[in-house]
Amino acid sequence: MYSRLSRKYGIQIPPTVKIGYGLYIGHGIGIIINDSTVIGSNCNISQFLTIGSNRGTPAIIGDNVYIGPSVCIVENVRIGNNTTIGAGSVV
């Protein structure tokens, strides 16, 4: 499934990513998530999103988080519950 999503939609979410219940992907295209990322429950992610890098500690995203389009979340970041990250942000 990972390779099919990657090829067809440009979504790279490795099977090792920990994802809580109720993840919503709006306009799913151009999404890259590092393999050690943790995403809480009921999160909403938008297109052109990058989370993490190839080294260091993972990004941890809390519950009920909205991430707008064209956002870059780097490694070693903890995003709290009930947070909104606006379009084009670098965290």
Which residues fall in each region the model found?
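Left-handed beta-helix
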Residues: 9, 15, 20-21, 26-35, ...
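Leucine-rich solenoid repeat scaffolds
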Residues: 89-91
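Terminal amphipathic alpha-helical/low-complexity segments used for targeting or macromolecular assembly
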Residues: 1-10
